[in-house]
Amino acid sequence: DLLVQKFNRTVGQEKGVRVQVTNLSSASKIGGFLKEAQKGGRDAPEMPDLFTCHISDATALGSDNLVDWNARFTAEELSNFVPGFLADGMTEDGTLLLFPISKSTQLLMCNGSGFARFSQATGVSYADLSTWEGFYDAAGKFYDWSGGEAFCALDYPIRSVELNALEHGSGDFYTKNGWYDTNNVVFKESWMQFARSLAQGHVVVSDLYSNTQVMTGDVLSSLGSSAAILYYNDTVTYRDGTQEPMDLHVLPMPKTAGADALMAQAGVGLCAYKTTDQKAEAAALFVRWLTESERNLDFVAQTGYMPVRNGAFDAIENYDKFPEPTESYRQLYAALKIMQESYTPLSEPRFEGYYGKVSQLYD
């Protein structure tokens, strides 16, 4: 809302454009709100001109009813954005319905104090965690060394399984009804690698948020959203009440050795409802302003999200406005920059009902 106010006082005032926030909704509920507004009726909310949503919400409204950002931005302008982030907001025919403003991904966060003791005793290093093979091997060694404690809590294990399988060359492993083909040999082996580690107690599925389990010393590390950085403390408080510095270490998502690395991406984008050409141009003006490199980095750096412009990524190395604890944020964005440079972003599955099935799987 502060950014909207700043836009209205500056560029908006200069160009005769005013953005007004009319409704606030969670990402999980915005789709239903938009469909209700589109349907209309006496008690229906007013359809907003500009809104954030997921691509599945956008396509449900109908591509013909939405602004194609390709028509509002030149090819040269779009070339300045991370290609995979743009692709995440496109339909199959290339229509750009959702303009990216920020993206989160998954990576590894470790209790550095605890890892130092583990490393000294076993020789396992942070470098060993760069591959899935090394990650699962380290998890087994930690279990043995610690006397039966889990090494890592995973927030979205099925996504990790997917990335590992695709990096191993699984190809398409989705069925027509929007689930996983267990007859796909490569996908099945990726799943079994995780399942074996889970059954042996080397890793666990998180109790909602893996960062909590790291901060209480229940696990040594977490594999979850980059946005979890917001919730990490400077100290680890163990179950017996003892404390020590967290010394948080943030590492890129493990990848398959010798393969092209993939990374998850999540986050809503900006979508404009098609009404008048004047409103579409005003929406594009706001999106340009919001995604300018420096402003985009300032916007995301407080939350653990990734900027969407290549130029914003380039500025991370010398960025000096991270919140406290500064070193944790610095490590996070150094890891994100590595991933932006050498990993390919992968969109989440778009099957209807997919997320409900995933929730049932975790339960």
Report residues per predicted region.
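C-terminal capping/gating helix-and-loop segments adjacent to ligand/active sites or protein-protein/ligand interfaces
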Residues: 264, 326-363
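Glycine-centered hinge/linker elements that transmit conformational signals in sensory
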Residues: 136-140, 176-208, 248, 253
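Short amphipathic alpha-helical coupling segments at ligand-binding clamshell hinges
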Residues: 3, 189-193, 278-290, 357
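Short, solvent-exposed loop/beta-turn-alpha elements that line the ligand-binding surface or hinge
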Residues: 70-81, 124-128, 152, 171-189, ...
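Conserved N-terminal structural module of periplasmic/extracytoplasmic solute-binding proteins
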Residues: 1-58
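Hinge/lid segment of periplasmic solute-binding proteins
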Residues: 52-107, 136, 245-254
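Extracytoplasmic/periplasmic substrate-recognition and gating elements
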Residues: 199-202, 239-311
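Extracytoplasmic/periplasmic solute-binding protein
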Residues: 95-101, 106, 133-180, 219-221
